[in-house]
Amino acid sequence: MSKIEKLSILGVRSFGPHHPETIAFNTPLTLIVGYNGSGKTTVIECLKYATTGELPPNSTRNGAFIHDPDLVGEKEVRAQVKLSFRSTIGESYVVTRNIQLLVQRNNKRTQKTLEGSLLLRNNGERTVISTRVAELDKLVSEKLGVPPAILDAVIFCHQDDSLWPMSEPAALKKRFDEIFEAQKYTKVIENIRLLKKKKGDELKILKEREVQDKANKERAEKVDRLMAQLTREILEAREKCNELSKQMEEESAKIKDKYEQANSFLKIMNDLQTKTEKLEYKKDAIVELRSRIEELPDPDEVLRNTLDEYEQTINRIVADRDHKAAQFHDLQAELKSARDQHTAKAAEQGKHQSDKEKYERQLVARERMIREAAERHEIRGYNGDLDDRRIAIFNERIQKILNDKRRELERLQRENQEELDRKTAVIAERESRKQSVIRDRKAAKDRIISLGKDMASIQGELSSIDIDEGTEEMLRAEMKELQARIEAAKADEQNANLDAQIKEVNEEIWKLESLSAKLARELVECTRLASERAQLDLRRKQLAERKRELEIMTNTWNEQFSTLLGEGWRPETLERDFSDVLKQQQLLVGEHRKKKDATQQELKQAEYQLSNARNLHNKLTNEMEACMRAVQTAMKEARDLDSAPPVDEYITMLETDEKELAEVETALKLYDELKKHYSTIKDRALRFNKCYICDRDFTNQEAAKTRLLEKVAKRLGDEEKKELLEDQAAFMKSLDILRAVRVKYDTYQRLSSELPQLSREIDSETNRREDLVRRLEDQDLAFREADNKLQEMETLNKHVMKITQLLKDISDAEKQVERSQQLSNIETRSADEINEEQTTCAEQTRAAQAKLTKLTAEKQRLKDLVRQLEVERLQLENKISSAVQQLERKKRLQESIARHKEDQNQARNAVQEADEELERLEPEIAGARAALDEARQACRAKEQKVAAERDAIAQTVSELNMINSEIQEYLDRGGPSSLAANQRAIANLETQMANLEGEMRELTVQINKLNKEIDNSDAKKRNIADNLTYRKNLREKDALEREIAELEARNAQEDYDRLIKEAHYLEAHRSKLNADRERLMGMMSTKDEEFRRLNEEYELDLKDAKAKYKETHIKVETTKAAIEDLGRGMAAVDHAIMQYHSKMMEQINRTIAELWQSTYQGTDIDTIQIRSDVESTTSSDSGTRRNYNYRVSMVKGDTEMDMRGRCSAGQKVLASIIIRLALAESFCANCGLIALDEPTTNLDSDNIRSLAESLHGIIKARQAQGNLQLIVITHDEEFLKYMQCSDFCDDFYRVKRDEKQNSVIVRESITRITE
């Protein structure tokens, strides 16, 4: 393990240029403490510069990294950073880096990097490894065992760059690509790709050369055949032979024409079947479309134009609606302003009239409220008269009761939340298991589909190979027979002893020349009979070969045909039986296709309905939340509360305000009557000197009269009326605010009852969609299996046709053999009978001449036969070699198909196991959810009960506080207002509000109409498109019916059978002509000069053609194999990169989750993770390339969101620290070093403590491994206390400024912090 030991800093930033400062790094913890600006971060900058050679941000120019020369009064300052470290194998190194800052005459500063060094210390010996800067950067990274990207972004991350995990996507991708060293592996793949492309170009050249060499090889073979043919030609029979050849060519052309005509009729038959299937499909599509569309009478062109213009129409309607909505909002603002003015005027109208009466009424109301509240909340001792002291005591007691209820509710909510969290965790665990099973199931399904595609490709390649075991056996049988014929021909040539016989006959010929003519005629006749017998032998041989070929074919494909047709199948009925089975399989494939298409259509409809339901649910949820916020805002404004009350209290609050307003208005009416009454008392006392109530005389009782007048004067004041009017205005304003949102409250209540039912519908549609997906997957599987079987049967179809053709050929050959036997059995006169009519001499002459001719011809024939058989043997050997190669390739393909089928079965078993696991998990999840709902309802009931008690007490306290404050305010208010001006203003405002409301109602009607048109647009658009599709299908159906009728009228089957029969007849005639030509060619002699010319040409140009072709063919095949190997190698590297990346990301995210959950103290984020999204790009020359896009996301429950732009500054700091710790854990296997610079920035006290405890746990866990070097740089000594640093180190380093304001490093005891 590598580690750093000491760091020396000289002339860097605030460190002086004359005396170096040194710091030693300990294991497992090194602490660096200092106030802001003391130079702590410079330590990290120097470590990073020493290891990577990179300067801090914004310090690459103008010498910002070097000590300012002006501070020391010098023109030049040299900075030096030395780092002592040990490599991964324990070697001791010292890296030194030097940098210079020079101030020139024009005060321009020049920064220059000087030569550094890497020193190896080994047993007292000091060896300089390198002094070049570029080599230093590479060597230090290698010796530490850490890539430069990890040193830069993880281990020695600068404070300015510490939040890089929260940077924008492009910068984040660049960081992670450097960390994963993606460019190295990308370059490897690119090199392999270029090499593969180069080999592909070479393959093209080799294939062209192969074609040329093959042509030369075929040309050489052709020359061989021509040379063999020339040896058998006879000049006397050339014209006749040419005539026969011409006749044969004419017959071949006729046969070819017949087969081509038959194939054209066969194509018509296939077209008829294809069009019939398409017609059935079109009919089904027409019925399905007709069931769901509303037919439109407009022409197609009008519908297409309407469809094209639909988007413009909708945009125009939306713009019109938005314009009217803007007008509505403007009117609404004007109406709100008018209402506010009206409310203010109405409040001012009655305020001064109700002050005094309200004051007295509120005194009575307060006593009544206290008695009622005491009785309601069981507070004893408040049934009698109440004075101010007892009222104050009551307020204190009820406030204490309210505080107790609040604490009780908080405790209950905390306990309930803990219970719900435990049950939610159970559900989350099972849901996680379910998602894992679903992912496994999807992977297995994808594997099945992939294997199916591979099998289809392999099956297509297999179908292209016409060679089978039967063909090989047939070729080997031909070779064996040909070898026997060669040996027999050679034996006949040796055993004949023809030279001696010819010599003996030549001695007799001169004696018997007179008898040669008659003997020659007899020989011609005998030769004709011999020809007939030879033709009979040829036909018997052909018949035997075709029977043997039929036997080989039936034995080879017996297993496949037995599987399809049963064990008792016969070649005679094979074509009809196989055609029936093939048609049944085609019908089965069609049925599976129809079912799959129907289910797919049903799935599309289900997805459309589910999407609509979800959109509606989201829309209604947003509307409900908006209504709830509006109602809560109005309640908060009406009561002037700090926080919004529950929306369910709206009706209670509205009824309370209405009741209070009625009471205030009643008090105002009573106030006027009381004022009249007190005016009468005052008038009587002044006029008649008597009390109006008791009729007491005030003569000689001036004191009593004065007291009465003073009391009446107080009653006649306007203060109480003023308070009543203010109360009236306040209640009216509150009621206006609450009544303005009554519609939204009703909407909220309605949506609260509708949304659960809509959620259940969404769940039902979701389950239906999942059922349809599973059904469609099963139907896809059944369709692929049936289609694969159909392809296998179609592959066998050519063998069926070949067996059928062999049966017909055998039948025709048997008939020809029978006719030849009849011709050869015709009786002719024998040689003895001829000799009886001739003289003995003539007969002997003819016999000798015939014998000489026969011996000569036999000698030449045997030579030609041996040569011809040798040529045929070479050709047959090449055919056998090619057949063996193709059979081996075919065997490899069949084995590959078998492996793919086995893999498919394993994947199907995995899908079945996943389905069983899902069926088991669904009831468990449902049970857990039911338990959670039941617990939630029970908890909610308990909380509601305590909350109701708290709210009742809170309402009492609120009402008492309100009435007490109003009573106190009455003592400070006074002064009437003018009513007339207020009434005129109110009338004008009411007229204005009525006009505005009318305009708003008209705009609302128009906007609703436009919204309805927009909502119905999608359905209309889809209906128009379906109408066009429906009409197109009708036209195509009519066209197909006409085409089918035309094809059926052509009677293609009868013409096909007739043409095949005529072709067989022509083949028989051609066979006869061929037999005649072969007989004549056997009599031809070889032209020696032509033979020599061909032989010279062969020796000069074509002698090595076969070897050259073989060499080129080997190069082509080896190059193909190399290209395939390069492709597999490239795929293997790509797969290894994917696996490595997935493994590392999983390890990093696991570490991040553990650190976050043990550190973060908030409840808004459960965990964070790094997401790497794979993006594949395809190009024509480089294939598919993968890129990774990274982002940091936060998770709460089942919700995942991007963290960038959504989290606080403290969460950014904490997340960045945790991500760096996780990256160091994963990528620093050879170096347990990491530095944290001011890790507590922007963190609150709870998270600071938690981070300290987590770091303590990490150090403790890694301490035993001996490879951890954690460097913590901070100004927060409380944070170090929480870390309990004394467990890991005895001292720390303090960075501070000396008297010259230079930074110095001082070593101090850890007890300075912990005490």
UniProtKB/Swiss-Prot annotation:
Coiled-coil intervals, chain numbering: 220-261, 321-429, 472-553, 589-674, 748-952, 979-1115
Domain (DH): give its ranges: 722-928
Cofactor dependency: Zn(2+)
- EC numbers listed for it are 3.6.-.-
Q: Where does the Zinc-hook domain start and stop, copy by copy?
A: 644-743
**Subcellular localization, as worded in the UniProt entry:** Nucleus; Chromosome
Q: SUPFAM superfamilies of this UniProt entry?
A: P-loop containing nucleoside triphosphate hydrolases
Against PROSITE patterns, the record matches this protein to:
DH_2 (PS50010)
> Which terms are listed as keywords in the entry?
Chromosome, Coiled coil, DNA damage, DNA repair, Hydrolase, Metal-binding, Nucleus, Zinc
Q: Which residues bind Mg(2+)?
A: 41, 159
Cellular component annotations (GO), alphabetically ordered: condensed nuclear chromosome; Mre11 complex
* Keyword GTP-binding appears in the UniProt entry: no
Sites binding ATP sit at 13, 36-37, 39-42, 64, 66, 68, 159
- Identify the stretch(es) annotated as Disordered: 336-359
Judging by the UniProt lineage, the source's domain of life is Eukaryota
Gene Ontology biological-process annotations:
chromosome organization involved in meiotic cell cycle; double-strand break repair; telomere maintenance via recombination; telomere maintenance via telomerase
Report the GO molecular function annotations: ATP hydrolysis activity; double-stranded DNA binding; double-stranded telomeric DNA binding; G-quadruplex DNA binding; guanyl-nucleotide exchange factor activity; metal ion binding; single-stranded telomeric DNA binding
Briefly, what is this protein's role? Component of the MRN complex, which plays a central role in double-strand break (DSB) repair, DNA recombination, maintenance of telomere integrity and meiosis. The MRN complex is involved in the repair of DNA double-strand breaks (DSBs) via homologous recombination (HR), an error-free mechanism which primarily occurs during S and G2 phases. The complex (1) mediates the end resection of damaged DNA, which generates proper single-stranded DNA, a key initial steps in HR, and is (2) required for the recruitment of other repair factors and efficient activation of ATM and ATR upon DNA damage.
The Swiss-Prot or TrEMBL record describes its family as follows: Belongs to the SMC family. RAD50 subfamily.
User: What binding partners and quaternary form does the record give?
Assistant: Component of the MRN complex composed of two heterodimers RAD50 and MRE11 associated with a single NBS1.
Copy the domain comment.
Answer: The zinc-hook, which separates the large intramolecular coiled coil regions, contains 2 Cys residues that coordinate one molecule of zinc with the help of the 2 Cys residues of the zinc-hook of another RAD50 molecule, thereby forming a V-shaped homodimer. The two heads of the homodimer, which constitute the ATP-binding domain, interact with the MRE11 homodimer.
- Name listed for the protein in its UniProt record: DNA repair protein RAD50
Organism equals Chaetomium thermophilum (strain DSM 1495 / CBS 144.50 / IMI 039719)
Organism classification, top ranks?
Eukaryota, Fungi, Dikarya, Ascomycota, Pezizomycotina
Gene from which this protein is expressed = RAD50
